[in-house]
């Protein structure tokens, strides 16, 4: 229902416009208060790169964060990541992730980033505290903040925004009548704009998600997803149809699709009931980090990598590296 409202195909959004106007007013005043110095912001002693969204709901931000971390690591930079840790509840903040940190503590996206990149990751509702915790632990050349475009309490040196290249900005309204967190004109002040899927517009960098072989959640075995038998596909991400479309493009014969809410918490019983012993449960990697402790032998996940055009990727990295060598 929310997708129909935000896309403009349902007139229900008209009923939500008063709330959207209020949201837009408040968010605009918050940003203005920081720009005018009425609220204080904190500047880190190292460059901060924000990877964020202008809209709510599954734009492909996490794969982009992972790509950026890995690219900078390959160039010899010491990279740290901070996040709010949405979906998790730590006993105390800031929380520095380690091999034993659970998604219940830190949220699924920080755990996924930590496991994929081995970069130091810290979470806190106050991102400045997370940055300070990272720097206290070890020296870093750059900090990447996962989301946080609207978190103006932390000053940033480079803003990178990921948009859904297919859905774009929906009906163009602020939350909750539409998907917008800020006006589209906010893009005029960012340093890079990544279009995930669809057709990139002038000034945007095209990005696509490339699937790897499927991985068994329990054993780590790898196999082409198309070889998995009797697949039941599940996704608890911001935009589940993207995952299902990826499987279709790969030629995976999906018998059933199951969509969950983003950051959904899972338990063994309900997930096990989705498939018989002859079927395969195929999920996203973001879902898998929440299921490893109780995974069954017929549970698999599909890792994806962000892929950018080489020339545009090189220019993007060049612009970021220029900050690190000042």
UniProtKB/Swiss-Prot annotation:
Group of enzyme by EC: transferase
Molecular function GO labels: ATP binding; tetraacyldisaccharide 4'-kinase activity
One Pfam family here: LpxK
Pathway as given in its UniProt record: Glycolipid biosynthesis; lipid IV(A) biosynthesis; lipid IV(A) from (3R)-3-hydroxytetradecanoyl-[acyl-carrier-protein] and UDP-N-acetyl-alpha-D-glucosamine: step 6/6
Keywords: ATP-binding, Kinase, Lipid A biosynthesis, Lipid biosynthesis, Lipid metabolism, Nucleotide-binding, Transferase
GO biological process: one example: lipid A biosynthetic process
EC number: 2.7.1.130
Domain of life, per lineage: Bacteria
Record keyword Secreted present: no
GO cellular component, one term: plasma membrane
InterPro entries cross-referenced by the UniProt entry: LpxK, P-loop_NTPase
Catalytic activity: a lipid A disaccharide + ATP = a lipid IVA + ADP + H(+)
Chain positions recorded as ATP binding sites: 55-62
Function of the protein: Transfers the gamma-phosphate of ATP to the 4'-position of a tetraacyldisaccharide 1-phosphate intermediate (termed DS-1-P) to form tetraacyldisaccharide 1,4'-bis-phosphate (lipid IVA).
Family statement drawn from the similarity comment of this UniProt entry: Belongs to the LpxK family.
Protein name: Tetraacyldisaccharide 4'-kinase
Native source organism of the sequence: Serratia proteamaculans (strain 568)
């Amino acid at each position: 229902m929310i997708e129909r409202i935000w896309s403009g195909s349902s007139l229900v959004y008209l009923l939500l416009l008063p709330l959207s106007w209020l949201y837009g007013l408040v968010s605009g005043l918050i940003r203005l208060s920081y720009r005018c110095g009425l609220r204080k912001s904190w500047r880190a002693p190292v460059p901060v790169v924000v990877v964020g969204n202008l809209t709510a709901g599954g734009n492909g931000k996490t794969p982009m964060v992972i790509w950026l971390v890995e690219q900078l690591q390959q160039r010899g930079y010491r990279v740290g990541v901070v996040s709010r840790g949405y979906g998790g509840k730590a006993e105390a903040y800031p929380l520095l992730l380690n091999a034993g940190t659970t998604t219940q503590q830190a949220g699924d996206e920080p755990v996924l980033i930590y496991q994929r990149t081995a970069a130091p990751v810290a979470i806190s509702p106050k991102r400045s505290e997370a940055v300070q915790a990272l720097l206290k632990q070890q020296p870093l050349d750059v900090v990447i903040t996962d989301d946080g475009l609207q978190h103006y309490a932390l000053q940033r040196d480079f803003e990178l925004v990921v948009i859904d290249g297919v859905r774009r900005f929906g009906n163009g309204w602020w939350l909750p009548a539409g998907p917008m967190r800020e006006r589209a004109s906010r893009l005029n002040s960012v340093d890079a704009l990544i279009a995930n899927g669809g057709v990139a517009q002038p000034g945007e960098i095209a990005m696509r998600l490339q699937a790897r072989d499927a991985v068994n959640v329990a054993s780590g075995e790898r196999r082409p997803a198309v070889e998995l038998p009797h697949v039941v596909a599940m996704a608890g991400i911001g935009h589940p149809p993207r995952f299902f479309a990826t499987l279709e493009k790969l030629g995976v014969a999906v018998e059933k699709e199951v969509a969950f809410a983003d950051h959904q918490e899972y338990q063994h019983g309900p997930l096990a009931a989705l498939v018989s012993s002859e079927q395969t449960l195929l999920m996203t990697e973001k879902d898998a980090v929440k299921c490893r402790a109780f995974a069954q032998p017929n549970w698999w996940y599909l890792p994806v990598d962000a892929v950018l055009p080489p020339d545009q990727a090189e220019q993007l990295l060049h612009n970021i590296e220029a900050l690190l060598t000042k």
